[in-house]
From Swiss-Prot:
It is found in: Cytoplasm. A motif ('HIGH' region) lies at residues 50-60. ATP binds at K604. It comes from Caenorhabditis elegans. This is Isoleucine--tRNA ligase, cytoplasmic. Its main location: cytoplasm. GO terms for cellular component: cytoplasm. A motif ('KMSKS' region) lies at residues 601-605. GO terms for molecular function: aminoacyl-tRNA deacylase activity; ATP binding; isoleucine-tRNA ligase activity; tRNA binding. Keywords: Aminoacyl-tRNA synthetase, ATP-binding, Cytoplasm, Ligase, Nucleotide-binding, Protein biosynthesis. Its EC number is 6.1.1.5.
């Protein structure tokens, strides 16, 4: 025999996955697959490094699934794919955790503790959750190498980062400057623009209208508007637009004069004002005003500060048209003030705010106060001084620190920069050379970000990171950028074993120009610089692996979330362009975000999403994988995560797939039992059966489609057809060929049907392996026996190629036509409450296309059988059957476009349009009504049956096809329907008893009332029911002395009640019986394949047998006591339990 193992009645997908995962681990399956492929062409993949300071979430699982699918696909498509995990280990995420734990409030606390001690604390936690990551990724089915990972803290990785920076320095792309930057006061460090763009929030801030008194006219005030009162102590200038019109207004009560932009006068909310003068902004230039605060009054003499400037950045859509300038707290302020000589780039900064966001001694009145807390104090003082014109609040979007979730300040910081702005043309050109899915993210979001790129501040005033490799003389004139450990050892004369701050801060380099010694600058690199360096740093390039890197750069593929357009994607491209003038990758999949079911961001504190591992343990990783990548999220859109979506995939995809596989194995075993011969699927004699030819053609066409789309990385296009395949397989092929597969049409036909089904199952298992690796492995380990394969894993196989000789577009078209007709007739049956078990006299199919009707007739026997109809008629003439066309206007779309004309157009469509106009519209897709050209989006066409069709015909249609069914009844049709109902009850009882086709049993049946039509039909048609079910049936209840039945049921059919008792032959049942009303379920505690592990497993089998997937269930003993969840299920053998819902 073929040696196929018996497939159990039910499956716990998660448990079977655990077994497969254990097998992979025990047999080193992933490592062996890599070893087997080492001589193949390389497919290079870069893995964006996560931080191990947090647990993996759905976003990580999504990107990991995408990476795994593409990696497996490339591997099984003939490539060697190094899948190496990497870790981000430096930077704010780590330091922020340590600061919270140790109560560190600023750099001074770190210096007291000592950098070595501080960094040692950081080193302890960087891999806190690495074990959980490895376990989760393994359980998700992601094949990735953790053993040979890379970490940004490895000295060899850091050395490559130094090399990269030294190359940029040689190219003249590194400079030191003062720049107003987003600053995290919680983390005491500046952030780059792309970091600041990651976490905007809507906040309410004070909005104050402040009067600045003119020196020459103290009664006249220029009114500026600001949402940052805390910056007012640092004010040095005001700006107005030179070409806009300003008004001088006078308060009729106080006599105070206010100057504002004419368009913004209403913002003062003062009805007591009169306009006394109008001035162009240029006329206000160089007017001098009194400083609000005395702290920097000396700047009037030093730099001619506290005067009015002109600039065109001033707008009329907000504020007052007068903009207050605190140049060290605003990027535009800084540029304007430098351009007008109010400040100089190289002067001492007027920035009286420290790294914690608190005022320094330069503002003694508020020294030590956090600036946001000082807003109220400053507003109070302005009021007391008579400078507060109006106080309000404004809701606006404001950036927060991506790590600490605290508001950022914009303040001037001396930093080391990479001159990105000079690279913009090359960045855009290199971006054009890459291929993105979806394309719009590359062409719009990312390209726009590149066009507006700013110089990158790569230095951070922190401790745990790769130190910036610059050694500078005390006067700043001599700078050495060290590019390697060896170079530092040579220049310093010291042995270097590590590159962290505690190891290199005290290393000095003698000056070559007599300037004493050079000391390292104190800053470390932005951790994004490190992750952006990973393509070469993970290989310790250029110190090692030079050929490996250069031969395989750029990467073939990367994938991360859409938020990385301003993160990793950006830094990869900047550094690759600057260093190699190449894009860093060829192909990219950019996924959207995974949100909670209500559309909110997933939050641990809100508990608004289910734990990922609970989902995996409940439904299996394959179901979660398929759910995530069969959604808009792989097209760059957002996904609202719903547990029901994962559950539905299990029900709609995996269970039909399992049942098809089980059906195949059962019938191969039955075939071998019947013939005594081994089933040989390799003996391929072309089948003449149209359904065999169709399913093989359909599957090979699917293979061709999937391969083509995967070549273009369009996962979103392939997963839908793959998941729908199983509905096609089970509800078309198996449903219409069940009797052939079971051998009812003879052994020759059975072999053809089994061979076709087997070939299709193996083909789809190989095709789906990268997407659902666990279940494909589970099936392969059994199915490989029928083809005599010795391959130990489906993942060692190459992906299938379509067999073009089996693709028959004609037969695929015909079956698609058949499906269309079947679906339309089913809709009529459902609408009219006509179960398929009850036969109908006639169905009529109307379509103008003769080819369509020919296709219908070619599969007439299947259509009639499936729909349980006696006669099929086709026609091109709808008038013959009283069918007319009817226009259905889309009022929403028409109303939006036609406005007042909509009513006339709709009236014409409803009451005046002719049949010929609608016929023409169906052909051409456009229609002119009252001078308006309408599209098929705006008008739909449906079919209507005339009033003369009331003689029993019911209709339904789509855009091109009409079906009509004769619903009139006669006795023979009713009797046949009743007979089918009973047959169905017996078959369901066999299933409930978990019998396979080779198991023998007999049934007793009682129909009440005894004189009902159903009782007479059962008596008359008993032999037909026995033949259809393969089960002997006896009229009457079982004798009193009979043993307990294997299964029982009681149900209603029409106006009768049917009670059935099934007795399995040779039954020595060692299981548990569960009763649910009139139904019984028997669960084996131990079978050849598995044994029941506990109470939860018992409930799973009960749910599966009774199709009870919703709601809670429990079990109770015959005495009414509850069965405890911790019970040893073996103690329940032989007992009958009651189901409780």
């Amino acid at each position: 025999m073929s040696g196929l193992s018996t497939v159990p009645d039910n499956i716990n997908f998660a448990r079977e996955e655990d077994k497969v995962a254990q097998k992979w681990q025990d047999e080193n399956t992933f490592q062996r697959s890599v070893e087997l492929s080492k001589d193949r062409p390389h497919f290079t993949f870069y893995d964006g490094p996560p931080f191990a300071t947090g647990l993996p979430h759905y976003g990580h699982m999504l990107t990991s699934t995408i990476k795994d699918v593409v990696g497996r696909w490339a591997h099984q498509n003939g490539h060697y794919v190094e899948r190496r995990f990497g870790w981000d280990t430096h930077g704010l995420p780590v330091e922020y955790e340590i600061d919270k734990t140790l109560g560190i409030s600023g750099p001074q606390d770190v210096m007291k503790m000592g950098i070595a001690n501080y960094n040692n604390e950081c080193r302890k936690i960087v891999m806190r959750y690495s074990g959980e990551w490895e376990k989760t990724m393994g359980r998700l089915g992601r094949w990735v190498d953790f053993k040979h990972d890379y970490k940004t803290l490895y000295p060899w990785f850091m050395e490559s980062v130094w090399w990269a920076f030294s190359e940029l320095h040689k190219k003249g792309l590194v400079y030191k400057g003062v720049k107003v930057m987003p600053f995290s006061t919680a983390c005491s460090t500046p952030l780059s623009n792309f970091e600041a763009g990651q976490n905007y929030k809507d906040v309410v801030d004070p909005a104050v209208f402040v009067g600045f008194k003119l020196l020459d006219c103290p009664n006249r005030q220029l009114v500026a508007w600001t949402t940052t009162p805390w910056t007012l102590p640092s004010n040095l200038a005001l700006v107005v637009h030179p070409d806009m019109l300003y008004v001088v207004t006078k308060d009729k009560t106080t006599g105070i004069e206010y100057v504002v932009l004419e368009e913004r006068l209403g913002e003062l909310k003062n009805d007591n004002l009169e306009v006394i003068e109008k001035l162009a902004g240029s006329q206000l230039k160089d007017l001098r005003y009194e400083p609000l605060f005395p702290y920097f009054a000396y700047m009037r003499e030093e730099r001619n500060a506290f005067r009015v400037l002109n600039d065109t950045f001033v707008t009329s859509d907000s504020g007052t048209g007068v903009v207050h300038q605190a140049p060290y707290f605003g990027e535009i302020d800084f540029q304007v003030c430098v351009a007008n000589g109010v400040i100089a780039k190289d002067q001492k900064m007027i920035c009286p705010v420290d790294e914690s966001g608190k005022y320094t001694s330069e503002v003694p009145d508020y020294q030590g106060v956090y600036v946001k807390d000082a807003d109220k104090l400053i507003i109070k003082r302005l009021k007391e001084m008579g400078n507060l014109v109006r106080q309000a609040e404004v809701k606006h979007s404001y950036p927060f620190c991506w790590r600490s979730d605290t508001p950022l300040l914009y303040k001037a910081v001396p930093s080391w920069f990479i001159n990105v702005e000079t690279l913009i043309p090359r960045l855009l050109a290199n971006n054009d050379e890459t291929y993105w899915v979806p394309a719009f993210v590359k062409e719009k979001r990312f390209a726009n970000w590149l066009r507006d790129a700013r110089d990158w501040a790569v230095s951070r005033n922190r401790f745990w990171g790769t130190p910036i490799n610059l050694w500078v003389s005390e006067d700043g004139e001599e700078v050495v950028c060290v590019g390697s450990i060896a170079e530092l050892e040579e220049l310093s004369g010291q042995k270097i074993t590590d590159l962290h701050r505690e190891s290199v801060d005290d290393v000095t380099i003698p000056s070559r120009s007599g300037r004493g010694v050079l000391k390292r600058v104190s800053e470390v690199f932005d951790c994004w610089f490190e992750s952006g360096s990973m393509p070469y740093a993970q290989n310790h390039y250029p110190f090692e692996n030079r050929k490996i890197f250069e031969d395989n750069f750029p990467a073939d593929f990367i994938a991360e979330g859409i938020d990385q357009t301003r993160g990793w994607f950006y830094t990869l491209l900047v550094l690759s362009t600057a260093l190699f003038n190449k894009p860093p990758f060829k192909n990219l999949i950019c996924n959207g975000l995974v949100l909670a079911s209500d559309g909110a961001k997933m939050s641990k504190s809100k508990k608004n999403y289910p734990d990922p591992m609970l989902i995996v343990n409940k439904y299996g990783a394959d179901a979660l994988r398929l759910y995530l990548i069969n959604s808009p999220v792989v097209r760059g859109e957002n996904l609202r995560f719903r547990e029901e979506g994962v559950r539905d995939l299990l029900k709609d995809v995996f269970l039909p797939w399992f049942n098809a596989y089980r059906f195949f194995v059962q019938n191969v075993q039955a075939y071998e039992h019947e013939t005594g011969n081994v089933f040989d699927m390799n003996v391929h004699v072309a089948s003449e059966n149209v359904m065999d030819r169709w399913i093989e053609s359909f599957t090979n066409s699917l293979v061709a489609f999937v391969r083509k789309e995967m070549d273009s990385y369009r996962l979103y296009a392939v997963v839908g057809p793959l998941t729908k395949f199983f509905d096609t397989l089970t509800n078309i092929y198996i449903r219409l060929n069940r009797k052939r597969v079971k051998g009812d049409n003879g052994l020759h036909e059975q072999h053809h049907a089994l061979a076709a089904l087997g070939r299709v199952l193996i083909l789809i298992v190989r095709l789906m392996a990268p997407f659902t690796p666990f279940f494909c492995e589970y099936i392969w380990l059994n199915l490989k026996k029928v083809i005599g394969s010795t391959e130990e894993s489906v993942h060692f196989l190459m992906l299938p190629k379509p067999d073009e000789s089996l693709i028959d577009e004609t037969v695929e078209r015909r079956v698609e036509v058949m499906r269309n007709v079947i679906d339309l007739v089913r809709l009529v049956r459902d609408r009219e409450g006509l179960a398929v078990k009850y036969p109908l006299k006639e169905m009529i199919v109307i379509n103008r296309d003769s080819q369509f009707l020919e296709d219908v007739k070619s599969l007439e026997s299947y259509i009639l059988l499936e729909l349980n109809v006696r006669k099929l008629t086709v026609s091109q003439d709808k008038q013959k059957y009283g069918i007319t066309l009817k226009a259905e206007p889309n009022f929403k779309i028409l109303g939006a476009r036609l406005k007042g004309e909509q009513k006339k157009v709709a009236d014409y469509l409803k009451n005046q349009i002719t049949e010929s106009e609608l016929e023409k519209f169906l052909l051409e897709g456009k229609l002119t009504v009252l001078g308006h050209e309408l599209s098929s989006e705006e008008v739909a066409v449906s079919y209507a049956a005339g009033s003369d069709q009331g003689h029993g015909y019911k209709t339904h249609s789509d855009a091109k096809t009409i079906v009509m069914i004769d619903t009139t009844e006669d006795e023979s049709l009713i009797e046949e329907g009743l007979c089918r109902e009973v047959t169905n009850r017996v078959q369901r009882l066999r299933k409930q008893a978990k019998l396979v086709s080779t198991d023998t049993a007999h049934v007793h049946i009682v129909v009440s009332p005894a004189d009902s039509q159903l009782a007479k039909v059962v008596a008359a048609k008993l032999n037909d029911i026995v033949s259809a079910t393969g089960t002997p049936i006896k009229l009457g209840s079982p004798p009193a002395a009979a043993k307990a039945p294997t299964a029982t049921s009681k149900s209603a059919i029409k106006d009768s009640e049917v009670e059935l008792w099934l007795f399995a032959e040779g039954d020595s049942f060692d299981g548990i019986t569960v009763v649910d009303g009139s139904k019984k379920v028997r669960v084996h505690v131990k079978t050849e394949k598995e044994h029941l592990k506990g109470y939860a497993d018992l409930l799973y089998h009960v749910r599966s047998a009774l199709d009870l997937w919703n709601g809670k269930i429990a079990l109770k003993n015959v005495d009414g006591s509850a069965v405890h969840p911790t019970v040893d299920v073996t103690s329940l053998v032989g007992q009958t339990l009651q189901l409780v819902r």
